[in-house]
A protein has these predicted regions:
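Beta1/beta-strand and adjacent pyrophosphate-binding region of the FAD-binding site
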Residues: 1-14, 30
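Glycine-rich FAD pyrophosphate-binding loop
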Residues: 7, 20-42
Length: 124
């Protein structure tokens, strides 16, 4: 039986971010997920600057090896009419691939990862 101070069930962005903070606080943390990472995740592939700040992401480091596409604006308009470009000049969001993003956050957490293992029993 594995022992730890904190068991985080789920290795997605919320679980891995929680694990990272707990590891930084000096706790022995394990993350358990029924999936193996990297995994395909059908989900929107965008993060905002607020997410970048909340997760303390180093965009230069992340973008060096993983998909990171800054979006500074968008086009909008009714069907069949001319589209209007709205450009904010600075990134309002970043395109990412969830399989890369989730794996990066989980690896970066510093927690012990038990992937491919569903939670079947829990004892205190």
């Amino acid at each position: 039986m594995d022992r730890c101070d904190v068991l985080v069930v789920g290795g997605g962005p919320a679980g891995s971010s929680c694990a990272r903070r707990l590891v930084r606080a000096g706790l022995d943390v394990a993350v358990l997920d029924k999936a193996r990472f990297p995994r395909d995740k059908v989900c929107a592939g965008w993060i905002t600057p607020a997410v970048v700040r909340a997760l303390d992401l180093d965009l230069a480091e992340y973008g060096r090896h993983l998909t990171l596409q800054p979006f500074t604006g968008f086009r909008t308009g009714p069907f069949g009419k001319e589209l209007r470009l709205i450009d904010f000049g600075t990134p309002i969001s970043y395109g990412i691939r969830r399989c890369e993003f989730d794996h990066y956050l989980l690896t970066r957490s510093g927690a012990r990862v038990m992937a491919g293992q569903p939670l079947t029993d829990l004892r205190r």
